[in-house]
């Protein structure tokens, strides 16, 4: 238990163009060295590419995130000199953060020329339940399933 008062969560302002809080969080994750305009250009460019193929790019992005969100993950826990990988459920906030992180990681490793193109293609693949980010989630779930026997070590 914390000794001091709990720090309140900061509210994220909705995105000016699409009115989405999720998109604002995504912009913040893409941003490096405080260059928000560059991060916005990347994400808006990706959403425009998605928009040329689909009706609602925000819906595609949210579907992609939903398909990448992990339900369970493993945490290391030492018990009597042995380290066990204990499966634990993921909090909703962490689910979203992990999904965004994995999508971004997968997009950065892709081969397309611009980051906007990489992001768009990774989101489109994730929305169709394929791609590197979805594979990462499947691997995480597989690890948790394999270590189900240690779930009684949960804390």
Swiss-Prot record:
One of its GO terms (molecular function) is structural constituent of ribosome. One of its GO terms (cellular component) is small ribosomal subunit. Keywords: Ribonucleoprotein, Ribosomal protein, RNA-binding, rRNA-binding, tRNA-binding. SUPFAM superfamilies: Ribosomal protein S7. Transmembrane segments: none annotated. GO terms for biological process: translation. InterPro entries: Ribosomal_uS7, Ribosomal_uS7_bac/org-type, Ribosomal_uS7_CS, Ribosomal_uS7_dom, Ribosomal_uS7_dom_sf. The keyword RNA-binding applies. Pfam families: Ribosomal_S7. Signal peptide: none annotated. The keyword Ribonucleoprotein applies. One of the primary rRNA binding proteins, it binds directly to 16S rRNA where it nucleates assembly of the head domain of the 30S subunit. Is located at the subunit interface close to the decoding center, probably blocks exit of the E-site tRNA. Belongs to the universal ribosomal protein uS7 family. Part of the 30S ribosomal subunit. Contacts proteins S9 and S11. This is Small ribosomal subunit protein uS7. It comes from Halorhodospira halophila (strain DSM 244 / SL1).
